[in-house]
Every structure is written in structure tokens, then in C-alpha cells.
């Protein structure tokens, strides 16, 4: 057993032996990461649609693993991790897998799980960390309520587990911010220390005045 696994196992024992009884006695909730064995570091990608999240992932992994397009291309979360071959697993399969700490996602309901996917591919980068791609924010007036599952709760779940949150924003579409602002101020509350905002496509502006005029 590696040194990392030994330390992780010992930390989990301390949580179960000391912190969990204390949490129950004092009626406070342990963070998600304290309840489950730590795995690979993971990065969560958020942002409005067509902001470049999936394109960035494809560039990083040097393969077209995620669909891209000007219009919204997906309505679910996708976990990307290392595997010996390219494969895709559905939400029900991965939440019942004993080696994956995703059982807590069951409470988000079948509509969420039906849109959840895990993709494996033989990328050397994914031996060191996992990626979580999210559907683009729906910023049209009233459109955010058309999702058939609790998107904000899904964001919170993955954000709590994430070691880094990359929030892509397209400055060429400054009006598309309704759900984006809501996610920034609610599900990500208290997790700002993990957050990095990326102004993607900003190089398309000729100067700062052109950027400001949008």
C-alpha cells in the first residue's frame, strides 16, 4: 500500500472514530470530504453555454471527448477519469459502484442520474486528477426553471468535492448572466477559495475599450 493510501486510511479512521461521534453529539454536519475516502484531486468546470469549457477539456486531453457547439450541447454533468480504454457509464451504474464516492448523488433523483455520465480514456493527465464538466448555464429569462433536476444542488455536490473550480465566462456575451450570477452567489457560497474565473475569448477584443463597451 502506498504512503498516500496509508495516510488517507488513517485520516478516515480518525474521522470515523473521533469526529463523526462528536458531530452527531453536537448536531453539526461533517463536510462531504470528511465522510468519504479521498480520491484523486478533481477540477470542476462551470460557466455559461459556449464559454469554452468543453473545448478547453478537449484541448487539455488532446482528444474530442466532449461535444462542443455554439448552442447548449449537453444537459448533464460528465466525470472524466483515467481508464485503459475509452468507455462511457451512466449515472445509475457509477452511483452504485463501490469504489466511487458518488452514492450521495442518489438524493438528487432519477432525472439527475439519467443525465450523469462517467467517461474513461487512456489519457496520462487523468492519472493525476479527474475532471468534471457541467452543462452550460441557462441565462435566458425563465429558462433556468426548465431543467428537470436540481442543477444548483448538483453544482454544490461537485464543488464541495473539487480541489479547483474553473468558472468560464464569455465576455462577448455579457447579457447571459442570470443563472450564472445565481450559481456564483448561492451554490458556491463559502467555496470561493477554490474558484478561479476565466475570461475566455478575451483575446478577440482589439483593446480594453472594445471589451468595456460590451
Predicted ranges, named:
Residues 1-139:
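Conserved G1/Walker A P-loop phosphate-binding module
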